[in-house]
From Swiss-Prot:
Disruption phenotype: Mutants have a developmental arrest coupled with embryonic lethality at 8.5 dpc. They show a major defect in the expression of respiratory chain complex I subunit NDUFS7/CI-20. One of its GO terms (cellular component) is mitochondrion. The lineage of its organism: Eukaryota, Metazoa, Chordata, Craniata, Vertebrata. It comes from Mus musculus (Mouse). The gene is Chchd4. Its main location: mitochondrion. Residues 61-105 form the CHCH domain. Residues 102-139 are annotated as: Disordered. This is Mitochondrial intermembrane space import and assembly protein 40. Forms intrachain disulfide bridges, but exists in different redox states. Central component of a redox-sensitive mitochondrial intermembrane space import machinery which is required for the biogenesis of respiratory chain complexes. Functions as chaperone and catalyzes the formation of disulfide bonds in substrate proteins, such as COX17, COX19, MICU1 and COA7. Required for the import and folding of small cysteine-containing proteins (small Tim) in the mitochondrial intermembrane space (IMS). Required for the import of COA7 in the IMS. Precursor proteins to be imported into the IMS are translocated in their reduced form into the mitochondria. A motif (Cx9C motif 2) lies at residues 87-97.
């Protein structure tokens, strides 16, 4: 006998082997592309930018949200041969704003790692032997 149990936000459904073997009678409903409550990707069906898309990571709503929207919109709607080449001022304004809030908009880790000076490696007896072997085999 199958049954359903609710545990907090979870709904647990137990089915018998017989229940599991019968074909499903569930009907799939096609998504309505014009449903305003339906989640969409970055670009809405009408071509507009979906500022509520989680893919933007909240960039459109932070302290530099207006600068981000301006730069992103300019790039999205750009018709230049080099797409976005007409948006330099908007991207510069966004970058300047983001630099005012380093805790909210941290620099990429790669850039931070490149900025760190490389520490010299101490030569040990093992590295000297390896180097000598390499020189011996290469000549």
């Amino acid at each position: 006998m199958s049954y359903c149990r609710q545990e907090g936000k979870d709904r647990i459904i137990f089915v018998t082997k017989e229940d599991h073997e019968t074909p499903s009678s569930a009907e799939l409903v096609a998504d309505d592309p014009n449903d305003p409550y339906e989640e969409h990707g970055l670009i809405l069906p009408n071509g507009d930018i979906n500022w509520n898309c989680p893919c933007l990571g909240g960039m459109a709503s932070g302290p530099c949200g207006e600068q981000f929207k301006s730069a992103f919109s300019c790039f999205h709607y750009s018709t230049e041969d080099i797409k976005g080449s007409d948006c330099i001022d908007q991207f510069r304004a966004m970058q300047e704003c983001m630099q005012k809030y380093p805790d909210l908009y941290p620099q990429d880790e790669e850039e931070e790692e490149e900025a760190k000076p490389v520490e010299p490696v101490e030569e040990t007896a093992d590295t000297k032997v390896s180097a000598a072997k390499e020189q011996g085999t290469s000549s």
